[in-house]
Amino acid sequence: MKQVVLGTHETSRWPEFAGSTWVRLQYMLGLTKLGIECFWVDRLAAVDPLTHSHTLEYLVERFDRTARQFGFHDRYCIVYNDGEKHFGFSESSLKSLTESAHLLLNISGHLPPSSQLMRIPRRAYVDVDPGFTHIWATQVDMGLGRHNFFFTTGQNVGTPHFKIPLNGVNWQAILPPVALDHWPARIDGSCKRVGTVGDWRGSQHAVYEGEYYGGKRREYIELLHLPRIAECAIELALCIGPEDWEDIGLLKSSRWKVLDPFLYAGDPYSYREFVQTSRAEFSVAKSGYVKSNSGWISDRTACYLASGKPALVQSTGCEWKFPGQKGLITFRNLEEAIAALKAFDRDYDAHCRAARQLAEEHFNSQKVLASVLSHVGM
């Protein structure tokens, strides 16, 4: 049986960031269904009980719980503090795996040169932050040279439409995979929630040619008066840090409903329930995705589509990928956002069916990951 290792960084540190966990889960579940023996190795830096809200024991227990719930409790290893401890399978098993595995999928390229996993012959850098990754690569060593395959969720990367130079790297565009068995359609016209879950600012920031590429805050502020003008309640389960708490009042005064993401979507199951009990997704994109014209499509949006929920999302230049389709509506400004909110409700059932069809045709993990394996010669 072919073996693939999913290499990640600090996923176990933040169990309440369930959307990030699902990004990795889709690969585990999808590859397993393809008949691949897939292993998850997460690199976790030291946990200081004085500064971190969770103990190491709690973090390991939460990760193990997720692994058991999704059937890979014997196929994960948390490498703690550069190998001081190993949780899940043992250090010796990890060493054996590096000698037998056929492919490493290095999510976001966070694994350092010293990682044992970098000995695996096929090493693929999987970029999930197009635009940011490519700007950073023009400024610092991102470790791209330690890989021999390169995948990105930016559909425009490598085309004349993308605004950031590639420095000779041959990126292959892929869509975010969704394990459809775990995301069944739940079309229900009685669902009311229109909104999304995510970060207000996020951790991705970059400056390129004097221009700032950042998170979602600025994009939401541009649409501040949307709920009042469109007469539509929009619910945002957003992680907003203390430095931006004043923004919560600003949003609420403009008739946005702000929810606690950790309460409503703080683990993989509640995250899925939040998505699947929604009427539709409404979300902006990080300004870095928009300004670079990356063609990025959110893994979260893919989950909404799989659930049979229309997605109304800010344009990043991906429209050419889905020409004339219902189910996925993009907007560039306030006027187009208002039109999008009105459009999906005029033929709601048709948009729901189209959303699921888009997921089956384009985001199905069986198709996306089979193409990845084919590209690397597996």
Give short role names for the model-derived ranges:
Residues 23, 161-280, 288:
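Conserved catalytic-core segment of nucleotide-activated headgroup transferases in glycan assembly
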Residues 6-161, 265-270, 274, 290-292:
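Extended catalytic core of nucleotide-activated donor transferases of GT-like folds
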Residues 113-119, 142-144, 160-165, 246-253, ...:
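Short loop/helix-cap segments at secondary-structure boundaries that form the rim of catalytic
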Residues 36-39, 123, 194, 234, ...:
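Hydrophobic anchor at the start of a short beta-strand
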Residues 10, 14-15, 19-21, 25-26, ...:
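Catalytic binding pocket for nucleotide-activated donors in carbohydrate/polymer assembly enzymes
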Residues 1-4:
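Extreme N-terminal starter segment of soluble prokaryotic enzymes
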